[in-house]
Amino acid sequence: MAAQGFLLIATFLLVLMVLARPLGSGLARLINDIPLPGTTGVERVLFRALGVSDREMNWKQYLCAILGLNMLGLAVLFFMLLGQHYLPLNPQQLPGLSWDLALNTAVSFVTNTNWQSYSGETTLSYFSQMAGLTVQNFLSAASGIAVIFALIRAFTRQSMSTLGNAWVDLLRITLWVLVPVALLIALFFIQQGALQNFQPYQAVNTVEGAQQLLPMGPVASQEAIKMLGTNGGGFFNANSSHPFENPTALTNFVQMLAIFLIPTALCFAFGEVTGDRRQGRMLLWAMSVIFVICVGVVMWAEVQGNPHLLALGADSSINMEGKESRFGVLVSSLFAVVTTAASCGAVIAMHDSFTALGGMVPMWLMQIGEVVFGGVGSGLYGMMLFVLLAVFIAGLMIGRTPEYLGKKIDVREMKLTALAILVTPTLVLMGAALAMMTDAGRSAMLNPGPHGFSEVLYAVSSAANNNGSAFAGLSANSPFWNCLLAFCMFVGRFGVIIPVMAIAGSLVSKKSQPASSGTLPTHGPLFVGLLIGTVLLVGALTFIPALALGPVAEYLS
């Protein structure tokens, strides 16, 4: 079993690096404002038709463009969900959503979280899924990538005030990265057996002679961007464990690759744009080390079996509860870590049925800020915050002004970095406390004791860090939970983007200082260790008390 797990992890990472390297080169061209070959004419026509100026923006203008687009998308999606019964492509005549569920869902998909307090096949029409949710899957992913584009430019430009043009970046990211790659993935999914139609639900006779209603819909097209954009919201309630979304072992492997593809490519692009590929490799090493350790822990925990079943004398050599037999324990464990290391949240197994330690690792990966590969764009700019913090700590230890890539890190940058890092832990801890203090929060718990608290902590961690996966034992479709989680998702997304853009605006105005004998190398194994230590230290100090009340207490009981 150990050899199979090692081979699975090694194969996954090898294929991932091979695919991400060329994509990283393409992203580097876009960051450097170099159009891809053959696209200049198309871009010129589109910019003219849309009235888009390619004049560069300062950080405030860039931020306002990103926020404006997302707020417009939020309003449109909210009213679309409220009135979906008036809109076309609704063969099942599904009614509009309640205001609190519509708000939660709209915020969820605009913030790239894709938390779902509903069952897709019984709640949303084809139009809502396709024109509402799928469109936001593209736009939220493009928004995250655009923010990291601006931050990377801040490190490479000197004595400037502009960071690029948000509209140009958003169009290029969508047209030349997200749409083509998602199209290829969708076609592969269709070839493998994923659904893509607009037929009404089909009544069929089962082998037992009973009738069953099979849901239909344009699944493959949404599934592709759901994974590529690290969105994670499933067309069906069972998400990627549903055979209509994820029919074969090949589609499952491609789904995992798609989740990590752009976050990995952005690390390669970062190295190319900064002129030092070792910087990108440093980030990849730090992410990969944490990732491999976490996968190993989850695999080990799940192959030990369920201790509660073992205590009752039942056969539980491995923990297969809540897992698809066609994928098994090892693949389910890998997928769980991939989807929570990135801000995806898609699942092929029920995380609520994992062992105490097996479920704690995905929860902790979210709590440290989704920086181990992370979401498209958001993962890298989240990790860059920890890089700045690590550089600052190292500067204090050696008595020098901290600097990174030649840019001095001053008080303003550190205040903004601390603010951005503290946003999500504050939301998680205060949100979980509020839920446990109120009857409306506690009444949603379907399990008592430490596991019930773990369900609450997982839900708030998932929402605040824009992941979207869940311990499904929590009944979250209530006004209290819909509003609480919507607030956490909104602030967790934009409460980090705003200080990140402010950091970019501050750094882009500075000159780059040449490296000296006293400059801390930020590309070697020493800094990789320092960066990993910073991530672990912040995560441990912040969440150990809460984790001790949940999964740790459950493991020890």
From Swiss-Prot:
The chain crosses the membrane at residues 5-25, 63-83, 132-152, 170-190, 253-273, 283-303, 329-349, 356-376, 379-399, 416-436, 484-504, 526-546. InterPro entries: KdpA. Keywords: Cell inner membrane, Cell membrane, Ion transport, Membrane, Potassium, Potassium transport, Transmembrane, Transmembrane helix, Transport. It comes from the Bacteria. GO terms for cellular component: plasma membrane. Its main location: membrane. It is found in: Cell inner membrane. GO terms for molecular function: P-type potassium transmembrane transporter activity; potassium ion binding. It is a multi-pass membrane protein. Pfam families: KdpA. Part of the high-affinity ATP-driven potassium transport (or Kdp) system, which catalyzes the hydrolysis of ATP coupled with the electrogenic transport of potassium into the cytoplasm. This subunit binds the periplasmic potassium ions and delivers the ions to the membrane domain of KdpB through an intramembrane tunnel. NCBIfam families: kdpA. The system is composed of three essential subunits: KdpA, KdpB and KdpC. Belongs to the KdpA family. This is Potassium-transporting ATPase potassium-binding subunit. It comes from Escherichia coli (strain SE11). The lineage of its organism: Bacteria, Pseudomonadati, Pseudomonadota, Gammaproteobacteria, Enterobacterales. The gene is kdpA.
